[in-house]
Every structure is written in structure tokens, then in C-alpha cells.
Amino acid sequence: DAPLVATQPEFSVNCLTPLRDGTFDQCLSTGMVPLAWSPLSGGKLATGDGIRPELIELLDELSVRESVDRATIAIAFILANPAEPIPIVGTQQTSRLRELAKATGVNLTREDVYNLIEASDGVSLP
């Protein structure tokens, strides 16, 4: 039998399910690679449509601090996860891909990540 080497959960700062349902725990324990689909929530994280205002505000604050756009911060959030998810972006525009690639140079602190999770959930972490 061939081992499973990848999984493709929906994961974004707006969809945190893999943090809570054991998906990323399994990836860490088995070496399986998570391929995060819809990392920008179908473009909603870029536009702000239908996203908690607190989350958009924090993404915007971090984007100013890091000199990138909101979507790039959202990708940086994914890259900050210890399970090392690979975001699957839906654009084919070279300029957009270049902008999102800047996420590899964004330095989100643990506090930034926790604050993003809290803003996404609308509740404080313990």
C-alpha cells in the first residue's frame, strides 16, 4: 500500500477548521503535507466582503506594518503554521503571484497569529 503523503483541507485565517479537527496534528505526526485550498476565502480576504470587520482591521494593520497587501498577510498566516501548509492560490496573474510570494518574507509573531485567530473567531483564546 502507498502511504498518504498529502491532504487538501480548506484553510485560511477565515477558516480555521484544520487547527481544530486534528488535520494539522495528523500532518505533524505523520509528515503528511497539507495543501491549503481557498487560502483567501474565495477572494473575500482580499476584498473584505463577508469577513468579520475585526479581522479585516487587523489584517490591514499588519499589512501596513509589513508593507504588503492584506492578501499577502493572509498567506503569511498560513505559512506561519508549524504543519507547513502550502497555500493553493487561484490566480494565474504573474503580478498577483509575485505579490503573494512576498508572504515568505513576512514575519508574523506568535502574538500576531493568536490575534488573527481571535479576530477570526470573535473570541479570546484561553
Language-model-detected regions and their locations in the chain:
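Beta/alpha (TIM)-barrel catalytic core signal, keyed to glycine-rich beta->alpha loops juxtaposed to Asp/Glu
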Residues: 1-125
